[in-house]
Amino acid sequence: MTRQHLWVLLVVAGSLVAGAADGHPLQGFLYGTVETLSKQEYTGVIRWGKEESFWDDHFNSVKENLPYQKYLPEGQRGRRRKLIEIFGKDVDVAWEGDYAARQFVARFGDIVSIEPAGKERADVHLKGGSVERVNGGSNDIGNEITIYDESLGEMKVPWERIDKVTFRSTPSNVDVTARRLSGDVTTVAGEFSGFIQWDSDECLSTDKLDGESEDGKMSIPFGKIRSIAREGAHSRVKLADGRDLTLFGSNDVDESIRGILVEDPRYGRVKIGWKAFEQVTFRESRDTGRAYEDYPAPHEIRGTVRDTDGHVHTGRIAIDLDEAYTWEFLNGSRADIDYLIPLESVRSIEPQRRGSLVVLRGGAQLDLREGKDVSDESDGALIWTRETMKTYLAWDHVQRIDLD
């Protein structure tokens, strides 16, 4: 797919300094220092691989350490291997021994640093002090990263040359001419608004929509597009100059699209499939999202679990014998729309006959039908009622989970 590179559009005004003024328009861009094995340091705006550019973008891999899986009854264990897609990325999820490997997903804003520990491994240091060893699973591991250093300009650093990447607040004097895509997406399930990644990839006004018209192939910068609507197996594209086009022949404009990602503040990140998609209307904005310092240090999940026998268990919780911190996510789907919800935003989870009713702290309610965290595929809940006492509940014994 054709992509005009972001970094040729970066202009650095003056000296780059650590720290950022509160609320400046460029605060959402990834920024930090790359230390290499040759003891050199490069500081500037970062693009991870060819996709992630903002603090609310996700670093994906697979967890190597599974401290809670030993509480799963032996009869519920098994050896399997599966390739799943998580918001546009293929993640290889394997079962090691008797335990299911688990996906690692964290926003870059929740990460202090990433240290490669081999070709397919890394240590991810999170705000709050915890460290997760991750192992392969997506192209976020083992891929090169691009940094725009103030003295050198654009530099691509191969994974095998990286010693450590340390993140820090984005300075206000970094000038990026490209805008972050944002707008409103209408679907069969209603409207979603926020920052947009088209085809789980294009996120900037300089990125291009590829397709064919009756007159030939086209590659249109998103900054020139007003709206895109699904029209059967094709797309109706309306340009800012008023022209209408019907495009086909690429995964940007037909049913082979890898999904439309929307960072909707009500839910977190949603992925909209072609069948659910109706139309997107873009809006011009210089906003790039939350600043690095706007992501607080995470903490353990605590709350109350009521079981189907009426007993109440209060304490620290590991949902699905996996998610135990506020930086982690609850995932579920319905009507060709996937939701990846930060657990810090979840108020309660109530298992239903099919899926779960999830209530968010902002008041929104979601009836999610698919996804390991919300269905009968869940490995249940582990509750530390005291530091020395743990209670395990299978998912079909959980009536409701309320988070503090």
Go through each PLM region and give its residues:
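Compositionally biased alpha-helical segments
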Residues: 22-404
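Positively charged n-region of N-terminal signal peptides that target proteins for export
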Residues: 1-5
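Bacterial N-terminal signal peptides
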Residues: 7-16
